[in-house]
């Protein structure tokens, strides 16, 4: 009989698939609640060290409970393959939420208005790490398109990595694996959703200052940043570093509550040396702190750097560095200074700009040292 059950969960459909595994919509047969079920692929699961590390990580994630952090329900192993069950989230990405005009309406609390065909359903893990997608995908995380910020089932499909990225990773470390096609032998589960054609981008599209500086947008931005600081203060207080903080991992639900997601890359601080050895990198390129690029031990200040890149982008309308290749991007992050936010957005908020620039300083000791400090600076 075809196997469509993983532990206590009945698989309903595939939400997305990548080199490290697949995310399913599943039903908890004990409670009848729907969850997002992340199932590791067979290849990584055969790596004993990776499996042990994931087991430790999963145990920690289950213990997290904070209103601004997506809830992980439980972890387990099915036929030797680790899985992670987490809540399904409905809402908008941070970028799309900020782009709502005063005439737009996010679904209010308690509303059950039917969704459009392009659902905004989003789970806690649509990105299985930096090496499972093409470099252009990672670099284009903030590029606008007609679909930007809204996530349907197609948002979980992933492209194969580019040749440039494969050759770069191969030269960087023989231990870095890319785009594995390992599947779960013996599993008769829904196949991954095919990736739809990408919508054409508007040529020469420029973000206008008046759009960036709309009072309602700036109010939402500041409130969202404060909530993110609360989430980071919580996870850092539990000895964790997110390591992959980026706009698509920050959702705003129907109650305007920010939800920090995708802790698939979160690690114990105590395991730092083992995780970064042999050139193994986790995170999305544009948002990586210099010390993360260099493979050095990380603490919460690496997440604060990523937060600074996000804030810089949302204030200026562009990323701090505009390289087209990994080599050039990492050189810029390590060696060059980005243009001042207020040179790109003349009427931007000076206080938020100061916070962004301090967060993205190259030396961790020169940044804010804790999320609580960032919260206080944003509140001034």
From Swiss-Prot:
Which cell locations does it reside in?
Answer: Cytoplasm
Residue ranges of domain Protein kinase in the record? 9-378
Under PROSITE patterns, the record lists: PROTEIN_KINASE_DOM, PROTEIN_KINASE_ST
What's a single GO MF annotation on this record?
protein serine/threonine kinase activity
Instruction: Recount the PTM note.
Output: Autophosphorylated on serine residues.
Asked if the Swiss-Prot or TrEMBL record annotates the protein with the keyword Nucleotide-binding, the reply is: yes
Return the GO cellular component terms, semicolon-separated: cytoplasm
Instruction: Provide the active-site residues from the annotation.
Output: 244 (proton acceptor)
Which residue ranges have biased composition labelled Basic and acidic residues?
A: 202-214
Q: What does the function comment of this entry state?
A: Pkn5 and pkn6 may have reciprocal roles in growth and development. Pkn5 may be a kinase that negatively regulates development.
| Family per record | Belongs to the protein kinase superfamily. Ser/Thr protein kinase family.
Name the UniProt record assigns to this protein:
Serine/threonine-protein kinase pkn5
User: What organism is listed for this UniProt entry?
Assistant: Myxococcus xanthus
Q: Which gene encodes it?
A: pkn5
């Amino acid at each position: 009989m075809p196997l469509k059950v993983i532990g206590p969960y009945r698989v309903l459909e595939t939400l997305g698939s990548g080199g490290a595994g697949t995310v399913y919509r599943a039903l908890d047969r004990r409670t009848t609640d729907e969850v997002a079920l992340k199932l590791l692929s067979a290849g990584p699961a055969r790596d004993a060290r990776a499996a042990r590390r994931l087991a430790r990580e999963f145990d920690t994630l289950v213990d997290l409970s904070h209103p601004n952090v997506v809830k992980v329900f439980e972890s387990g192993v099915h036929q030797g393959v680790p899985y992670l069950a987490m809540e399904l989230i409905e809402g908008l990405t941070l970028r799309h939420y900020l782009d709502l005009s005063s005439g737009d309406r996010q679904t209010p609390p308690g509303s059950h208005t039917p969704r459009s065909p392009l659902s905004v359903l989003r789970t806690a893990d649509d990105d299985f790490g930096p090496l499972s997608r093409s470099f252009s995908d990672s670099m284009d995380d903030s590029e606008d398109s007609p679909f930007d910020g809204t996530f349907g089932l197609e948002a979980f499909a992933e492209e194969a990595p580019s040749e440039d990225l494969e050759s770069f990773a191969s030269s960087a470390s023989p231990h870095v694996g890319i785009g594995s096609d390992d599947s779960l032998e013996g599993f008769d589960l829904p196949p991954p959703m095919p990736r739809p054609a990408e919508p054409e981008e508007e040529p020469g599209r420029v973000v206008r200052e008046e759009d960036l500086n709309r009072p309602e947008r700036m109010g939402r931005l500041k409130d969202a940043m404060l909530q993110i600081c609360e989430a980071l203060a919580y996870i850092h207080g539990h000895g964790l570093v997110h390591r992959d903080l980026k706009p698509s991992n920050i959702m705003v639900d129907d109650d305007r509550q920010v939800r920090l997601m995708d802790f698939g890359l979160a690690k114990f601080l105590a395991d730092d040396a083992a995780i970064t050895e042999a050139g193994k990198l986790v995170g999305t390129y544009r948002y990586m702190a210099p010390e993360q690029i260099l493979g050095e031990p990380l603490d919460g200040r690496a997440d604060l750097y990523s937060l600074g890149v996000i804030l810089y982008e949302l204030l200026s309308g562009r990323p701090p560095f505009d390289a087209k290749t990994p080599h050039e991007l990492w050189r810029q992050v390590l060696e060059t200074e980005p243009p001042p936010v207020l040179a790109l957005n003349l009427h931007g908020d000076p206080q938020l700009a100061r916070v962004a620039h301090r967060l993205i300083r190259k030396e961790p000791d020169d940044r804010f040292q804790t999320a609580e400090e960032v919260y206080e600076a944003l509140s001034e």
